[in-house]
């Protein structure tokens, strides 16, 4: 009686006040299928009631479609997609006894949609807005349309004109692009040239295509033209991505040729910070905004695919008119968790003069690059040809993993039919043991060194040789999951591995032992710890401490005072964005219909690896993932600039 009970519960909240049987049944079905929440329907009720009797309850159906669209990361709903969203959103594999079949439900939605559109037309102009488009009307919640309009117009203005800087001379270009052991390619040089001349540039490319090299070169060029160090900001959406940005820049500075001591020192002091830290405060009460602009002349943002529409709006509003904005990113990675895919919209514009695409990767071998390309194109046959097979039932699979090729390779470890949980758990444990995370493994030994108590990493926050060795070992491997819950998710795998670390027991507090990977889940500036920071427990001065890398420094915190955190033997692919590991295991869910299976999650997962990646799951799950690509409708349009 699930549908009947849900209809009764909704009626207690006045949802809807009247309405036909079909309207009530559709809304209940969407709630049971968890495609819409009670809170969202209460908001819909408030919108309908504000219309003061001007619309009938069919408006609930249209608003439900808008909420489902927004949940999918879209800033708007195209009217032509409404029926499909509602039908998919209300699909239930095993329909309750008191419900209609999926086919009957779909017919019900189609029958109700015309009245829903008519009701929406009456509501238009207040909380929801209609924007005509050549490929169908776009419907927005007012907040989203305001953000789309602001981002589109601001970026269009930035990209439309030069900032008055003269082109780089050949001498300037040579001085800025000198590196030991390699030369910049034509596209990288073009990116440096454009950044000097334009107020807005997007540099896009996959891992290893040289985005950080471009940043280093453009900083050298602009600083040689007297751009002050305190007028520059490097930022990223997450703490880990910001940290990695600073680390990567210092690595490239070390390889820079012909760099005088003063400029090298300045470049090495640049650190990445989160966009939230850059803007100060929290939304909507940012410290820096349109009324109080940032005192900057250049802002470089990495991992821009992760920036949602509203954060992009806040960032752009806070920039002075004469400030350059450079966005770096890979459009093939996962988009932001929240609404929008601004980077994807901009990169997707053909021949856009503000976009430079880098295509030559120096990180991946030809085989690995072919694998990544196959994932992006959704070509299962090419993926199979570009990967090596590891037998799921082979207990020695990790040995063969290393034997087949030493590095730069992608592997597949597929179960026939359904995944075997007991075998998977054996493989997860074998992986953790192989990479020194369990028992007397190398990470555990390094973290248990009694000499750490007096090490300068703990006493002075310096990245000592001991601390560097620990972090290097920690990043030798990582298990990446698509989902958080269940045996093939973050929680299940972390619980399995920490039990093995504690001889089969699930500890009340895992931080009482050394060598346990930990990830911060809440920004805590007072501790200099941020969401996404990954550290490890070590033998401290007065018990167990947790140390985190911070460029050439170390942040240390007593385990008992650690802010909100979780284990990090495994982490989601989403959380891994902006990170690199030598070897990764990407674990697919056992349900091929899982909504989080898509090309971007597979691509993002395997490209976190610097050496090897192995995908564990079923072939049907992989096929399902490659058949889907996240396509978001944001409405951000700069076409008139192209």
Regions found by a protein language model. Name each.
Residues 189-192, 196-402:
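ASCE P-loop NTPase helicase motor core
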Residues 533-642:
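C-terminal accessory regions
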Residues 172-200:
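Conserved pre-motif I regulatory segment
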Residues 93-101, 253-267, 444-467:
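Short mixed-charge
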Residues 98-168:
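Interdomain "pre-motor" coupling segment immediately N-terminal to P-loop NTPase/helicase cores
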Residues 332-518, 524-527:
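Conserved helicase motor core of P-loop NTPases
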Residues 1-97:
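Intrinsically disordered, low-complexity N-terminal extensions of AAA+/P-loop NTPases
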């Amino acid at each position: 009686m699930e549908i009947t009970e849900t209809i009764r519960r909704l009626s207690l909240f006045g949802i809807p006040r009247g309405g036909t049987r079909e309207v009530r049944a559709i809304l209940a079905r969407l709630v049971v299928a968890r495609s819409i929440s009670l809170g969202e329907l209460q908001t819909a009720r408030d919108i309908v009631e504000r219309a003061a009797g001007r619309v009938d309850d069919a408006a609930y159906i249209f608003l439900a479609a808008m909420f489902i669209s927004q949940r999918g990361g879209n800033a708007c709903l195209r009217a032509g997609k409404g029926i499909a969203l509602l039908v998919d959103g209300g699909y239930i594999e095993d329909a309750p006894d008191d419900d209609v079949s999926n086919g009957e439900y779909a017919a019900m939605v189609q029958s109700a949609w015309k009245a829903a559109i008519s009701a929406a037309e009456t509501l238009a102009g207040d909380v929801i807005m209609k924007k005509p488009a050549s490929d169908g009307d776009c419907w927005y919640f007012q907040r989203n349309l305001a953000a789309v309009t602001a981002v589109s117009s601001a970026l269009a203005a930035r990209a439309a004109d030069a900032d008055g800087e003269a082109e780089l001379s050949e001498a300037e270009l040579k001085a800025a692009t000198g590196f030991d052991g390699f030369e910049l390619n034509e596209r990288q040089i073009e990116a440096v040239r454009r950044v000097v001349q334009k107020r807005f540039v997007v540099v896009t490319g996959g891992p290893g295509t040289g985005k950080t090299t471009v940043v280093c070169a453009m900083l050298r060029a602009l600083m040689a033209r007297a751009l002050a160090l305190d007028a520059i900001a490097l930022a990223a959406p997450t703490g880990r991505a910001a940290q990695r940005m600073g680390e990567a820049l210092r690595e490239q500075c070390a390889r820079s040729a012909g760099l005088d001591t003063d400029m090298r020192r300045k470049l090495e002091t640049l650190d990445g910070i989160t966009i939230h830290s850059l803007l100060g405060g929290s939304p909507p009460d940012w410290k820096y905004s349109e009324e109080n602009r940032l005192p900057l002349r250049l802002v470089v943002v990495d991992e821009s695919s992760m920036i949602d529409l509203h954060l992009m709006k806040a960032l752009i509003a806070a920039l002075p008119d004469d400030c350059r904005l450079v966005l770096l990113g890979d459009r093939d990675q996962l988009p932001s968790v929240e609404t929008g895919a601004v980077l994807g919209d901009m990169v997707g514009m053909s021949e856009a003069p503000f976009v430079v695409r880098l295509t030559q990767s120096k990180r991946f071998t030809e085989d690995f690059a072919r694998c990544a390309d196959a994932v992006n194109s959704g070509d299962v046959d090419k993926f199979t040809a570009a990967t090596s097979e590891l037998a799921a039932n082979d207990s020695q699979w990790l040995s063969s993993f290393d034997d087949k090729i030493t590095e730069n390779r992608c592997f597949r470890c597929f179960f026939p039919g359904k995944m075997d949980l007991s075998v998977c758990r054996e493989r997860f444990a074998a992986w953790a043991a192989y990479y020194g995370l369990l028992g007397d493994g190398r990470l555990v030994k390094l973290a248990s060194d009694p000499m750490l108590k007096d090490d300068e990493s703990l006493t002075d926050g310096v990245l000592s040789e001991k601390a560097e060795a620990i972090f290097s070992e920690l990043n030798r491997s990582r298990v990446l999951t698509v989902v958080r819950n269940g045996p093939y998710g973050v929680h299940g795998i972390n619980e399995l591995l920490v039990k093995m670390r504690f001889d089969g027991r699930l500890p009340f507090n895992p931080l009482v032992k050394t060598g346990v990977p930990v990830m911060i889940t809440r920004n805590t500036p007072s501790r200099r710890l941020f969401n996404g920071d990954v550290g490890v427990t070590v033998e401290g001065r007065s018990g167990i401490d947790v140390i985190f890398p911070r460029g050439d420094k170390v942040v240390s915190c007593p385990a008992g005072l650690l802010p909100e955190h979780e284990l990090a033997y495994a982490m989601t692919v989403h959380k891994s964005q902006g990170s690199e590991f030598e070897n990764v295991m990407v674990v697919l869910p056992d349900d091929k219909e899982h909504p989080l299976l898509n090309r971007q999650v597979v691509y993002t997962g395997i490209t976190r690896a610097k050496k090897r990646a192995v995908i564990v799951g079923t072939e049907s799950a992989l096929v399902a993932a490659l058949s889907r690509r996240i396509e978001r409708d944001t409405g951000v349009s700069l076409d008139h600039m192209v």
